[in-house]
Amino acid sequence: MKFELKTTDGRARRGQLVFERGTVQTPAFMPVGTYGTVKGMTPEEVRETGAQILLGNTFHLWLRPGQEVMRAHGDLHDFMNWQGPILTDSGGFQVFSLGHIRKITEAGVHFRHPINGEKIFLDPEKSMEIQYDLGSDIVMIFDECTPYPATYEEARKSMEMSLRWGKRSRDKFDALGNKNALFGIIQGSVYEDLRDVSLDGLLEIGFDGYAVGGLAVGEPKEDMHRILEHVCPKIPADKPRYLMGVGKPEDLVEGVRRGIDMFDCVMPTRNARNGHLFTTDGVVKIRNAKYREDTSTLDADCDCYTCKNYTRSYLYHLDKCNEILGARLNTIHNLRYYQRVMQGLRDAIEQGKLDDFVTEFYRRQGKPVPPLAENDVK
């Protein structure tokens, strides 16, 4: 993988990630394909929304279908018939999400299979092996996602263990002869000095890109913005920056304003299945009875298949009848909306008009523009 930075506007960056499997324009949003599928969508449909890279889930793909099945197909690209780049998370966040049914030690994580109760162990070395079999274009180190809230001491211990796991991940990745990219993950909760220690430790190990982890886990938005404003300028400019698990459309905008290049989130797909649709003028909750006879287009500014062919009334009807097509059409739209936001951000940065884009984005959403830290203002 090669990262090329083309231009900047304030702290926002316009670049591209070059892989053997294709080039990804940044800032980029990665749809989440947990089990080797973006729910309800064919790979061709996902690509038509504008997506150039997907996220796969190491933890879930390890449990089902397993490494043997993946190896029999070649890798995840062949298994799911997506020939573009794929980033896989390490499984750390999913293990963190298991809560009481897992035990974290220095060696790794002991937990019970969430489906059959079988005892399982996952560590940095195993995570690297799984991601090697998946053929991931971007591999993430195995880390502990620090819960929120965490005391300073809890956050420090968690971050330090993640650093040690990061070194083990790097060593195993290299031992496997993996020629793809490996990203480090910056931890430290809401404490700036711990984030600094984490980044310094990761830089010493050396990675192809750096993710900001442990955010969007319940902390106030102000804390997320503060940490991004603190951390992003310290990440080497020639390395891509990835904000994990984020977020709402406005979170993408705010991340880009602060220097983030990559995002992923289940929100556009999960919310679509629940009738929660993102539009240029704000959220449409299509289950609301006021849409029963609404013959207007979902989003007049959108060029997706759904908006070009169907009315809000029809989408309301499909949802009311629990028709599978409803979830599919909603997903097509939400994913296209997210990609249109990213395209708008990329174009604005290229033209040196990011402030204008941000102002118009929030005006249409009916929200005030969140302030940047003083040292972030051009």
UniProtKB/Swiss-Prot annotation:
Any one of the GO CC terms: cytosol
Residues the entry annotates as binding Zn(2+): C302, C304, C307, H333
GO BP term (any one): tRNA wobble guanine modification
Free-text comment on the cofactor: Binds 1 zinc ion per subunit.
Reaction(s) the record says it catalyses: 7-aminomethyl-7-carbaguanine + guanosine(34) in tRNA = 7-aminomethyl-7-carbaguanosine(34) in tRNA + guanine
Entries under PANTHER family matching the protein: QUEUINE TRNA-RIBOSYLTRANSFERASE
Complexes and interactors: Homodimer. Within each dimer, one monomer is responsible for RNA recognition and catalysis, while the other monomer binds to the replacement base PreQ1.
Protein name: Queuine tRNA-ribosyltransferase
Lineage start: Bacteria, Pseudomonadati, Pseudomonadota, Gammaproteobacteria, Aeromonadales
Gene: tgt
